Every structure is written in structure tokens, then in C-alpha cells.
Amino acid sequence: MARENKKELIGRVVSDKMSKTIVVEIVQRKMHPIYHKYLKVSKKVKAHDEKEVSKVGDKVKIIEVRPISKDKRWSLVEVLEKLK
């Protein structure tokens, strides 16, 4: 049975130096459990960019896919906003 509920994330491209691979930084706001203050938490993930359309600074949407390599478990869906 195929799993249809795949995670989608939106983030900024911070590196496109690898062939068909981009590094996307995802920034989320999480509340501290004791101090109840919102903190910015970021993580970087590698995503597959088959057509190499995204550049550094672009806002992109990525989706969870089967493992492509040791580090890649995400794939580019679309470029939401190009950097000018």
C-alpha cells in the first residue's frame, strides 16, 4: 500500500553547488516549554532538483520521497518565489 500523506515543507535554497541537489533551510517557530517564548528553529535538508531550476535564495516547496541517496529524502515540487 502506498502512503499518500507525504510531508511538504517550504524553505529557502542556501546551496546549489551539487549536481541535481539543493540544500534547503527550513525555519520554524517553536514555543519553549517552560518560558513560553517563541524561538526560531532551523534545519537544513538536501533535496533532489532533477531539472536544476532553483538557485540560491529562491523560496521552494519540497515533498518527502523515498530515499534517493544517503542524505536525500526530499524532492523539489516547485519554485514559489525567485530571488531578483
Swiss-Prot record:
Keywords: Ribonucleoprotein, Ribosomal protein, RNA-binding, rRNA-binding. GO terms for cellular component: cytosolic small ribosomal subunit. The keyword Signal does not apply. It comes from Borreliella afzelii (strain PKo) (Borrelia afzelii). Disulfide bonds: none annotated. Belongs to the universal ribosomal protein uS17 family. InterPro entries: NA-bd_OB-fold, Ribosomal_uS17, Ribosomal_uS17_bact/chlr, Ribosomal_uS17_CS. One of its GO terms (molecular function) is structural constituent of ribosome. This is Small ribosomal subunit protein uS17. The keyword Glycoprotein does not apply. Part of the 30S ribosomal subunit.
